[in-house]
C-alpha cells in the first residue's frame, strides 16, 4: 500500500480512538437468543433485532434444513442467469400476497435494496427528499445519485411540504417506517397524503416495522392504512434471517430487473434461505401471540422505567435509553455488562452529537423475569435504585 493511504488510514483510526468512537466486533455465541455467551460469561441479551424470536426457532431451523435438502447450498448465479429458483419465486409470491403488491425484487441486504432503487430510478433534475434520520444506506445513495437531495427535519411535515412546494420536477420522498435508533414511527398517513397532493412518489424502508406492527405484522404502512409506491422490507429483524425485498407494482419490478445493479450483478440469495423465508412469512402472519407478547413486554418496560429521565416512549420494541455524552454512554453500557446485561452504546456518527444512548431491543422470547432484571440493573447503574 502507498504511504499516502497508510497515513490516511492511521490518521482516521487515531481520530476515532481520540473521540471515543472506535468500534470493534466481539465474538458472541448465541447472539440471536435472549441469553448470549461472551468469553465464557453469560449475559441477558437486549441488543439483538430478533423482535419476534424467530432467529433460533426450531421450526424455522427445520425449514432451512428442508431447503438445503431440496436445493443444496448456494444459488450458483445471479437471478437473471440460473440463480432464481422455485424457492425464490415462492418467496416473492408470498410477500406480494401478504403485503398487497404485484412485484417483489429480492436482495442480499436492506442496504442493497435501498441503494438499488435510488441508483436505478433517479436522474439529474430529479428531487430526492429524505428525513434527516434515514438510514446510512439511503443518505449515502442520495449523496451519490445524480438527483438533487434535500433533507427535512425528522418527521417534520411542514418542512417537507415547504421543500415540495418549491419544486416542479419529478420528486421522490423517502422515509423509514420505524426509525432504528429512536424507535419512533413516521407519520405515514399524513406524509402519504402530502406526497399525493404534490404528485411526488413515496418510498418507505420498513425494516423495523414489518412483522411487528399492523394486522398480520404487515408493518407500519399497513398500520397507517397507506400503500407507498416503493416498500422495502428486510429479513434480518422480525424474520430472523437476512436479506431484503423491494415491493412495487409490476412495471417497477420489471424496471428493477433491468436496471437495479445490486440485483442484476449479485449472486442470488441461497435457495434454502429463500425457502426458510417463505416459512417465516407464514409464521409472522399466523402467530399473533408473538406480537401480543411484545406488547406485554413493552407495557412492563414502561411500568418499570417510565418515570426515568432517560426513558423514551415508543410503540415498537426499540427502546432508546438516552444518555447524551458519548463516554458516559460507554461507561453505563460497561456497568450493565458487569451486572450481566448486554447492551450496546450507540454513539455518533450513528446518532447525532450529544444523543448517545443505549439501544434496548425487546424480543418475544424475553421473559417477565428478564425484564425485571433489566429494569433493576438500569436503575442501579444510573444511581436511582
From Swiss-Prot:
Tagged with keyword Transferase:
yes
Alphabetically sorted, this entry's keywords are:
Biotin biosynthesis, Pyridoxal phosphate, Transferase
The answer to whether keyword Signal applies is: no
Report residues binding pyridoxal 5'-phosphate: 110-111, 180, 208, 234
Gene3D superfamilies (UniProt xref)? Aspartate Aminotransferase, domain 1, Type I PLP-dependent aspartate aminotransferase-like (Major domain)
Residues at which substrate binds:
23, 135, 350
Q: Which InterPro entries match?
A: Aminotransferase_I/II_large, AON_synthase_class-II, AONS_Archaea/Proteobacteria, AONS_Proteobacteria, PyrdxlP-dep_Trfase, PyrdxlP-dep_Trfase_major, PyrdxlP-dep_Trfase_small
What EC number is given for this enzyme?
A: 2.3.1.47
Positions of modified residues (N6-(pyridoxal phosphate)lysine) = 237
Query: To which pathway does this protein belong?
Result: Cofactor biosynthesis; biotin biosynthesis
Which BP terms does GO give this entry?
biotin biosynthetic process
Its needed co-factors are: pyridoxal 5'-phosphate
Task: Name the reaction it catalyses.
Answer: 6-carboxyhexanoyl-[ACP] + L-alanine + H(+) = (8S)-8-amino-7-oxononanoate + holo-[ACP] + CO2
Against Pfam families, the record matches this protein to: Aminotran_1_2
Give the first-level EC class, as a single word. Answer: transferase
Molecular function in Gene Ontology: 8-amino-7-oxononanoate synthase activity; pyridoxal phosphate binding
Family membership, please give it. Belongs to the class-II pyridoxal-phosphate-dependent aminotransferase family. BioF subfamily.
Q: What does this protein do?
A: Catalyzes the decarboxylative condensation of pimeloyl-[acyl-carrier protein] and L-alanine to produce 8-amino-7-oxononanoate (AON), [acyl-carrier protein], and carbon dioxide.
Subunit structure of this entry? Homodimer.
Name the chain's protein.
8-amino-7-oxononanoate synthase
Species the sequence originates in: Vibrio vulnificus (strain CMCP6)
Protein's gene: bioF
Amino acid at each position: 500500500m502507498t504511504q499516502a493511504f497508510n497515513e490516511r488510514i492511521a490518521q482516521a483510526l487515531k481520530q476515532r480512538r481520540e473521540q471515543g468512537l472506535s468500534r470493534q466486533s466481539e465474538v458472541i455465541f448465541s447472539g440471536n437468543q435472549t441469553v448470549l455467551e461472551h468469553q465464557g460469561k453469560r449475559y441477558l441479551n437486549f441488543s439483538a433485532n430478533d423482535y419476534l424470536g424467530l432467529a433460533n426457532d426450531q421450526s424455522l431451523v427445520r425449514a432451512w434444513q428442508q431447503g438445503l435438502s431440496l436445493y443444496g447450498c448456494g444459488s450458483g448465479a445471479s437471478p437473471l442467469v440460473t440463480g432464481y429458483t422455485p424457492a425464490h419465486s415462492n418467496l416473492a409470491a408470498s410477500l406480494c400476497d401478504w403485503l398487497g403488491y404485484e412485484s417483489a425484487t429480492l436482495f442480499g441486504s436492506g442496504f442493497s435494496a435501498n441503494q438499488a432503487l435510488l441508483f436505478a430510478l433517479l436522474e439529474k433534475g430529479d428531487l430526492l427528499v429524505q428525513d434527516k434520520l434515514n438510514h446510512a444506506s439511503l443518505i449515502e445513495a442520495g449523496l451519490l445519485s445524480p438527483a438533487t437531495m434535500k433533507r427535512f427535519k425528522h418527521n417534520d411535515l411542514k418542512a417537507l411540504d415547504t421543500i415540495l412546494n418549491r419544486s416542479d420536477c419529478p420528486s421522490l420522498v423517502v422515509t423509514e417506517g420505524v426509525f432504528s435508533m429512536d424507535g419512533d414511527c413516521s407519520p405515514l398517513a399524513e406524509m402519504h397524503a402530502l406526497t399525493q397532493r404534490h404528485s411526488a412518489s413515496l418510498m418507505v424502508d420498513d425494516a423495523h416495522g414489518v412483522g411487528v406492527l399492523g394486522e398480520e405484522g404487515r408493518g407500519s404502512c399497513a398500520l397507517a392504512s397507506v400503500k407507498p409506491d416503493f416498500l422495502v422490507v428486510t429479513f434480518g429483524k422480525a424474520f430472523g434471517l437476512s436479506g431484503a425485498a423491494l415491493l412495487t407494482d409490476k412495471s417497477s419490478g420489471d424496471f428493477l430487473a433491468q436496471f437495479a445493479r445490486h440485483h442484476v450483478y449479485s449472486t442470488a440469495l441461497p435457495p434454502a434461505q429463500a425457502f426458510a423465508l417463505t416459512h417465516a412469512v407464514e409464521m409472522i402472519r399466523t402467530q399473533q401471540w408473538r406480537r401480543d407478547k411484545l406488547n406485554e413486554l413493552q407495557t412492563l418496560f414502561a411500568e418499570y422505567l417510565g418515570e426515568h429521565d432517560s426513558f423514551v416512549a415508543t410503540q415498537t420494541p426499540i427502546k432508546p435509553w438516552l444518555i447524551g455524552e458519548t463516554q458516559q454512554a460507554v461507561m453505563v453500557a460497561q456497568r450493565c455488562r458487569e451486572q450481566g446485561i448486554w447492551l450496546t452504546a450507540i454513539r455518533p456518527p450513528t446518532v447525532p452529537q450529544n444523543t448517545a444512548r443505549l439501544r434496548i431491543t425487546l424480543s418475544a422470547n424475553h421473559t417477565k423475569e428478564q425484564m425485571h432484571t433489566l429494569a433493576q440493573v438500569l436503575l442501579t447503574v444510573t444511581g436511582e435504585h
